[in-house]
Amino acid sequence: MVKLTSIAAGVAAIAATASATTTLAQSDERVNLVELGVYVSDIRAHLAQYYMFQAAHPTETYPVEVAEAVFNYGDFTTMLTGISPDQVTRMITGVPWYSSRLKPAISSALSKDGIYTIAN
């Protein structure tokens, strides 16, 4: 016969190893900051590609906070607060490599932070 304390200890051990998760709306600022962090990192890694895209699409503008974050190699997350969710979505999904590069990286970063999103 298994003791109740053994079962409780096993459940506690499993719970301790499971990562905490949070479900947030896609427009939540924490989700936007993760998305923008991935976006800024991608711009840094592929700067020439972004310059070519912007030259071909001059009406596609970026908030000054994004440009500052790209060229400031310190902690940039506080610079990115206050950018509207609609603007975040427009910038990130507006590039041709969104599906192939940004979307998987954003999904991975959100998952790593224990964040799952739901539609607004």
From Swiss-Prot:
It comes from the Eukaryota. The keyword Signal applies. GO terms for molecular function: structural constituent of cell wall. One of its GO terms (cellular component) is fungal-type vacuole. Residues 1-20 form the signal peptide. One of its GO terms (biological process) is fungal-type cell wall organization. This is Seripauperin-1. Belongs to the SRP1/TIP1 family. Seripauperin subfamily. PROSITE patterns: SRP1_TIP1. The keyword NAD does not apply.
